[in-house]
């Protein structure tokens, strides 16, 4: 069968590569993809994510069995609804179900209604009221744009002044446009963060290995928030009892609640969690695979990925198996200056194969050449599976030291939280 992956980043590269390795899959198209993906035998389609009608026409012309939707903005724009209306199958939530991600206020309302543990909060569209709430609550405190903001709409403010400034930028200065026209202001939760993913159809779900992402740009969790600078899975120091608690107090009630609300969920559910003294609590929901977590979770899948997704969509019990030993670790290489201003067109090192996988995010061929150049903030990611986090770090960082990363940067401490002296 022929499949279509919608999106262009490292996440979509990992999804498409895994689908192409599946038994019954002959060809995988990625729209729009990036040039680095072609090195893995993937076919690019020059249609951007927002052009739903062109994507649908392409899927029909090329007899695509189903589409896998990667990015959040496409889901929020109703791409799955449009595919379904055209008689095509797509793996991802409808616009109504995706509101769990594209409105943080809606997600909070669902959590409160279905008794899901999360931070206390207030939602505001009026700056003066938001300011008064911040001053009343004190710092540290968290200010979030209600809508989608490319993973950059969250400010963990260490002072009241910082929080007020963040609220002002969103509500008065229009920093995130409509996405920041409302803000959710939350209590700061103290603890270690981790991610839990599940394949979902309605109230049926299948949990994936736990993962830990590294959001800040620089070593030691310093610098601005990014889309993610690296990750590893599973999280070796996280007790299974914590995962079980998260499943029973968070994943199950939320999915059953969405069914009860008439918004049944299909796709990948990503729960951003924090382990507090009171147990796991929700920081955020994402209604699709995470980036960079996808790149370290999918290499651990030992069953047939395309068959698994097909079964889940058809309501058939899937046979899903995971590698149950070792750790998969990945480090993102980004353009200098990311997540703020950065240059494009930096020459990239040659692709690694074998023990170290290269997933491309922002990469394009130079004109009239097969040399890859940087074409985005996050550029590529190196991933390996080893016996331990330390062994994974050694493998990746040795490889990176041998690469010419002039004009690029990466964190040197991905996975260090898992190494307990």
Curated annotation (Swiss-Prot):
- Per UniProt, residues of the ATP-grasp domain are 108-314
The UniProt record lists the EC number as: 6.3.4.13
Entry-linked SMART domains: GARS_A, GARS_C
Specify which residues bind Mg(2+) according to the UniProt entry for this protein: 284, 286
Per the annotation, how and in what number is the cofactor bound?
Binds 1 Mg(2+) or Mn(2+) ion per subunit.
Q: Which Gene3D superfamilies match?
A: 3.40.50.20, ATP-grasp fold, A domain, ATP-grasp fold, B domain, Phosphoribosylglycinamide synthetase, C-terminal domain
Q: Where does ATP bind?
A: 134-195
What Pfam family does this protein match (any one)? GARS_C
**UniProt keyword Metal-binding, yes or no:** yes
Keyword list, A-Z? ATP-binding, Ligase, Magnesium, Manganese, Metal-binding, Nucleotide-binding, Purine biosynthesis
GO molecular function term, any single one: phosphoribosylamine-glycine ligase activity
**Keyword Ribonucleoprotein tagged:** no
Pathway membership: Purine metabolism; IMP biosynthesis via de novo pathway; N(1)-(5-phospho-D-ribosyl)glycinamide from 5-phospho-alpha-D-ribose 1-diphosphate: step 2/2
One GO term under biological process is: 'de novo' IMP biosynthetic process
Task: Name the PROSITE patterns on file.
Answer: ATP_GRASP, GARS
Superkingdom as given in the UniProt entry? Bacteria
Please give the InterPro entries that the UniProt record associates with this protein: ATP-grasp, ATP_grasp_subdomain_1, PreATP-grasp_dom_sf, PRibGlycinamid_synth_ATP-grasp, PRibGlycinamide_synth, PRibGlycinamide_synth_C-dom, PRibGlycinamide_synth_C_sf, PRibGlycinamide_synth_CS
Q: Which cofactor does it need?
A: Mg(2+); Mn(2+)
The reaction(s) catalysed by this protein are: 5-phospho-beta-D-ribosylamine + glycine + ATP = N(1)-(5-phospho-beta-D-ribosyl)glycinamide + ADP + phosphate + H(+)
The UniProt entry's sequence similarity note says: Belongs to the GARS family.
This chain belongs to the protein called Phosphoribosylamine--glycine ligase
**Which lineage ranks, top first, belong to the organism behind this chain?**
Bacteria, Bacillati, Bacillota, Bacilli, Lactobacillales
* Annotated gene: purD
């Amino acid at each position: 069968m022929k499949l279509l992956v919608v999106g262009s980043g490292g996440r979509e590269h990992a999804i498409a590569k895994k689908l192409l390795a599946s038994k019954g899959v002959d060809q995988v198209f990625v729209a729009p993809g990036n040039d680095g993906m072609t090195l893995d035998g993937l076919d690019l389609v020059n249609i951007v994510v927002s052009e739903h009608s062109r994507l649908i026409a392409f899927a029909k012309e090329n007899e695509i069995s189903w589409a896998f939707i990667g990015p959040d903005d496409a889901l929020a724009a109703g791409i799955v609804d449009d595919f379904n209306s055209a008689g095509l199958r797509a793996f991802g939530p409808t616009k109504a179900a995706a509101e769990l991600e594209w409105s943080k206020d809606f997600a909070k309302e669902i959590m409160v209604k279905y008794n899901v543990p999360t931070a206390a909060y207030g939602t505001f569209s009026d700056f003066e009221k938001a300011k008064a709430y911040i001053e009343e609550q004190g710092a540290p405190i968290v200010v979030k744009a209600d809508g989608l903001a490319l993973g950059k709409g969250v400010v963990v403010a260490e002072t009241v002044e910082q929080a007020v400034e963040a609220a002002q930028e969103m509500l008065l200065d229009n920093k995130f446009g409509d996405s920041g026209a409302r803000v959710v202001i939350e209590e700061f939760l103290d603890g270690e963060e981790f991610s839990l993913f599940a394949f979902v159809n309605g109230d049926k779900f299948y949990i994936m290995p736990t993962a830990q992402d590294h959001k800040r740009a620089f070593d030691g969790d310093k610098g601005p928030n990014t889309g993610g600078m690296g990750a590893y899975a599973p999280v070796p120091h996280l007790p299974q009892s914590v995962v079980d608690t998260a499943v029973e107090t968070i994943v199950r009630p939320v999915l059953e609640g969405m069914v009860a609300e008439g918004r049944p969920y299909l796709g990948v559910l990503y729960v951003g969690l924090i382990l507090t003294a009171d147990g796991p609590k929700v920081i955020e929901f994402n209604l699709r695979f995470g980036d960079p977590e996808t790149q370290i979770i999918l290499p651990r899948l030992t069953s047939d990925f395309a068959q698994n997704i097909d079964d889940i969509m058809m309501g058939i019990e899937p046979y899903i198996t995971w590698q149950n030993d070792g750790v998969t670790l990945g480090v993102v290489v980004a353009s200098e200056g990311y997540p703020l201003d950065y240059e494009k067109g930096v020459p990239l090192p040659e692709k690694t194969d074998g023990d170290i996988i290269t997933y491309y995010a922002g990469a394009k061929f130079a004109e009239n050449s097969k040399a890859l150049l940087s074409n985005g903030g996050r550029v590529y990611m190196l991933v390996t599976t080893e016996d331990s986090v330390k062994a994974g770090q050694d493998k990746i960082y040795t490889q990176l030291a041998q690469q010419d990363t002039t004009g690029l940067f990466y964190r040197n401490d991905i996975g260090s939280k898992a190494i307990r002296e």
